[in-house]
A protein has these predicted regions:
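Short S/T/G/P-rich N-terminal loop/turn motif that feeds into the first structured element of a domain
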Residues: 1-69, 74-91, 95, 103-129
Length: 129
């Protein structure tokens, strides 16, 4: 076993946000682009934050469900997630997003809300590049 080929981290407690959206498959690429330009970058560089508040944000597509987009955030801390969750800030971003992405979308699931924000990453195994 080559231990230099991977990293393993345990003992974490990183809050996880999962959002599942449904839309016309023809607009998925546009959604991903506008989501990145509005939500990802503006939440990452929100005024008043000392650093990017999330460790990662991934966008997943399921070939068996065209038009379904799953977004997964790994937040650094719940406090940083809460800061970005400021209602006025979120409403501002939603207005900007809606002005750039006029297509209908449906929030299908938000498992982190169903679990009362109880989903956390506790270990991570990653292959080194």
């Amino acid at each position: 076993m080559n231990h230099n080929a991977y990293t393993y981290t345990s003992g974490e407690r990183r809050p996880i946000e999962v959002l599942v959206f449904s839309m016309d498959p023809a607009v998925v690429d546009e959604f991903i682009r506008v989501d990145h330009e509005i939500w990802t970058l503006k939440e990452a560089f929100m005024d008043g934050l000392a650093k990017i508040p999330f460790l990662s944000k991934e966008v997943w597509l399921d070939d068996s469900k065209p038009g379904e987009v799953t977004i997964v955030f790994v937040w650094d801390t719940q406090q940083q997630w809460d800061a970005v969750g400021n209602v006025e800030f979120q409403q501002q971003l939603q207005r900007e997003f809606d002005s750039r992405f006029p297509h209908p979308i449906t929030l299908v699931a938000a498992p982190h809300e169903d679990s009362r924000f109880g989903i956390h990453r506790v270990t991570r195994f990653e292959r080194k590049q």
